[in-house]
């Protein structure tokens, strides 16, 4: 999966699948981002406690403006990083953003299992967002690999401050 000097090898075929599907989903990213997070909380209700803005909130998740803002931001960043993966040969999220993401995920105790739940929720959200004839093993693998690359980049930054 990785080439010399840490460059990511993401095939043209996978890139084409990601770009084609992202073009369809991008128009509805606010709604899809929220659906993505609702799936995470459906699978792992305790994950709500990892988000300070949800801990003491009585606002239903579906209408929580802070969750909506966070959800679209995460969904768009994830999809844009996937779309740029082949061309850039690496995750294109700014280094400062990756450091912040790594620090935040470390602070809130995010573990491998959380990333797995998020991966499953992302793939299910994408599957539901696309026409049925577009979704299949190739599409699942393309998005799964792109997500795994993003997670690997975040995990690289999940180190306690020295």
Curated annotation (Swiss-Prot):
GO terms for cellular component: cytoplasm; nucleus. Binds 1 heme group per subunit. Heme b binds at residues 66, 70, 100, 104-105. Its main location: cytoplasm. Residues 9-159 form the Globin domain. Its EC number is 1.7.2.-. Homodimer. This is Anaerobic nitrite reductase GLB1. It comes from Hordeum vulgare. The gene is HB.
């Amino acid at each position: 999966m990785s080439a010399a000097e840490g460059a990511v090898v993401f095939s043209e075929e996978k890139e084409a699948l990601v770009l084609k599907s992202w073009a369809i989903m991008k128009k509805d990213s606010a709604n899809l981002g929220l659906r993505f997070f609702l799936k995470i909380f459906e699978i792992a209700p305790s994950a709500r406690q990892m988000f300070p803005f949800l801990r003491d909130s009585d606002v239903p998740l579906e209408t929580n403006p802070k969750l909506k803002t966070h959800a679209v931001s995460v969904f768009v960043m994830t999809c844009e990083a996937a779309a740029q993966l082949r061309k850039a040969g690496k995750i294109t999220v700014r280094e400062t953003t990756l450091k912040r993401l790594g620090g935040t995920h470390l602070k809130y105790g995010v573990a491998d299992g959380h990333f797995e739940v998020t991966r499953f929720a992302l793939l299910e959200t994408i599957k539901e967002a696309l026409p049925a004839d577009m979704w299949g093993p190739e599409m699942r693998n393309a998005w799964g690999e792109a997500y795994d690359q993003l997670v690997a980049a975040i995990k690289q930054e999940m180190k306690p401050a020295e």
